[in-house]
Structures are given as C-alpha cells and as structure tokens.
Amino acid sequence: MVKESIPKEGENIKIQSYKHDGNIHRVWSETTILKGTDHVIIGGNDHTLVTESDGRTWITREPAIVYFHSEFWFNVICMFREDGIYYYCNLSSPFVCDEEALKYIDYDLDIKVYPNGKYHLLDEDEYEQHMNQMNYPHDIDVILRRNVDILQQWIEQKKGPFAPDFIKVWKERYKKIRNY
C-alpha cells in the first residue's frame, strides 16, 4: 500500500502522468509547491525537464502555474508567454500524491485556451482510439464528458485557475518562493 502524502509549500516534487493501462505517459522532473491540501495542489515550474514515455526529453519554455483538484477530472497548466497567458487543460483522473510524486491518469482530451479567451477541445480522435484500445469503462466516458462541460463553464465564467486574481496571486507567490 502506498502512503498518501500531501506536499508542503516550497517543496519540489515530480509530476507523473499515466495512461489508463497503467503505463507512464510523461514526467515533469520538478515543480515547486505553492499550496498543498487534501483537495487542491497548486505548483509552479519554469524550464523543467520533461521525459516522455519513449524516453525523449524536452524542457518547458516558460514559467507555468499548475492546478490540480481532487474532485475534478482535469488539471490546468497556466503558461506565461510574451503575448499573454495560455492555458492547457488535461482531462484526467483526480490527482493522488505519494512520497514519489503527484500522479494522475491522462485521458487524452485537452482544452487549449488562448489569451483572448477563445478555446478549443483537442485530441478527440486520440481519445476515441484509446477508449477502444484500452477499454475505458462507459462510466469513465460519462465522467470525462461531464468534466469537459464543467471545464468549459469555468473558462467562460473565469472561475478557478481562469480567474485573473488566481494568476496574479500564484505567479507572485512562485516568484517569492523561487526568489525571482
């Protein structure tokens, strides 16, 4: 049995993304925790090493704030680019934390939000393919579709990580913790 452990503010952790079949999908080597509770994890990273399932590696290009919630089937990456804030939202299982990393299952569907507020649902074909290959249960499909709707409402209502104050507060907290 894996012991669950909530990371503390200022701690650096790994983030591990899996696929439904249990295979590792992607690993972010270091994220600094800005807030850690049973329900919400908020972190920050910048120029972080990412390792793909096939062993390829790359480095993130810009600072980002990451948002995970234990009750929703998505997580959000807020990326700070020269032309504004972009959001990349992964439809995923709720997170779990253990002594090794923060972990979740990536369910292929993504929503990309642009600085002007427009957004697009991505990778529906990949989702359908993996749903068939990995035999996603019908219940998972229903939950994910419902969470796509919730996520779109949050985007349109500027709720949670899409609220302007969220970005201001957590970007400043990250700068302070990292001594930028």
Curated annotation (Swiss-Prot):
<keyword id="KW-0479">Metal-binding</keyword>
<keyword id="KW-0378">Hydrolase</keyword>
<keyword id="KW-0460">Magnesium</keyword>
<feature type="binding site">
    <location>
        <position position="110"/>
    </location>
    <ligand>
        <name>Mg(2+) 2</name>
    </ligand>
</feature>
<feature type="binding site">
    <location>
        <position position="123"/>
    </location>
    <ligand>
        <name>Mg(2+) 2</name>
    </ligand>
</feature>
<dbReference type="GO" id="GO:0017110">
    <property type="term" value="F:nucleoside diphosphate phosphatase activity"/>
</dbReference>
<comment type="function">
    <text>Has nucleoside phosphatase activity towards nucleoside triphosphates and nucleoside diphosphates.</text>
</comment>
<dbReference type="GO" id="GO:0000287">
    <property type="term" value="F:magnesium ion binding"/>
</dbReference>
<protein>
    <recommendedName>
        <fullName>Nucleoside triphosphate/diphosphate phosphatase</fullName>
        <ecNumber>3.6.1.15</ecNumber>
        <ecNumber>3.6.1.6</ecNumber>
    </recommendedName>
</protein>
<feature type="binding site">
    <location>
        <position position="108"/>
    </location>
    <ligand>
        <name>Mg(2+) 2</name>
    </ligand>
</feature>
<dbReference type="InterPro" id="IPR007295">
    <property type="entry name" value="DUF402"/>
</dbReference>
<dbReference type="InterPro" id="IPR016882">
    <property type="entry name" value="SA1684"/>
</dbReference>
<dbReference type="Pfam" id="PF04167">
    <property type="entry name" value="DUF402"/>
</dbReference>
<dbReference type="InterPro" id="IPR035930">
    <property type="entry name" value="FomD-like_sf"/>
</dbReference>
<dbReference type="GO" id="GO:0017111">
    <property type="term" value="F:ribonucleoside triphosphate phosphatase activity"/>
</dbReference>
<feature type="binding site">
    <location>
        <position position="106"/>
    </location>
    <ligand>
        <name>Mg(2+) 1</name>
    </ligand>
</feature>
<feature type="binding site">
    <location>
        <position position="126"/>
    </location>
    <ligand>
        <name>Mg(2+) 2</name>
    </ligand>
</feature>
<dbReference type="InterPro" id="IPR050212">
    <property type="entry name" value="Ntdp-like"/>
</dbReference>
<comment type="similarity">
    <text>Belongs to the Ntdp family.</text>
</comment>
<feature type="binding site">
    <location>
        <position position="110"/>
    </location>
    <ligand>
        <name>Mg(2+) 1</name>
    </ligand>
</feature>
<feature type="active site" description="Proton donor">
    <location>
        <position position="26"/>
    </location>
</feature>
<feature type="binding site">
    <location>
        <position position="90"/>
    </location>
    <ligand>
        <name>Mg(2+) 1</name>
    </ligand>
</feature>
